[in-house]
Amino acid sequence: MYKLKIFSYLPNPRVWKALIAGNICGVEVEVIGDKPANLGTWLWDFNPKMLNEDELNPDHKYARVGKRGFSGVLYKTDSFLKAHPFGTVPAAFNPEGNIGIFESNSILRAVARVGKEFNLYGQDPYEASRIDSFLDANLVFAREAQVYMLDYDNVSEEGYERMTAAYEFYLSGIESALEESPYIAGADLSIADISFVCDFSQFLREGHYEDVLKDKGFSLIAEKFKDEYPKTLKHLISLNKRKEFSTVLGTYLDWYKSKLQITRK
């Protein structure tokens, strides 16, 4: 039986964090969801379901005004909002459905804490806190990246500079960490590595909008990633090749590896 259930829009690299961790530490994670545009036709709940066409109206007892990335009417049960006060996805639940866990790194932590087959969260409270430090730094980067990636067509000079600064600060820290140890937080693989792979792989998708950015006078922020952060690139590609990662990420990074002429070995 699953140890964690997640409802989200799909595909979602942030959900992949929990799935990869589950693969490594032996935790079954159930994921239910749909394309972002379709979530307005779902009842958001511990047991989510698609609504019938005649149920889709603003007078439905669970109709709510969409916020943060969703417009129009959404359908969220009272129990969903009790478990998830911010009403966002991905939304995770314990097996009983009475405890909600939100924010992808917190969901990732939950999987690591439940998992017994492999320790992904440090050998003692100090190592765990160091891992948390990287997760917090990752969150700052990911928040800035989300704003940038959601509106390439209208990115401003100020927004571009903010994203560039966040990128350089985050990547320089990861590069420095990897100069001292084989994994981001130390000698062992941890959820810090998993979070990095998923969020940074998503950021690299800016490459698909190169022409849009050029039309606005901007170059790709990650254009010189290979040369400026070689250890970070090597770490990203190395983890992507591991079965626990590749079965979740699939071909998500293939376009980028092809661009850099990185072969599958």
Where are these regions (language model features)?
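GST-like fold's C-terminal all-alpha helical module
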Residues: 122-241
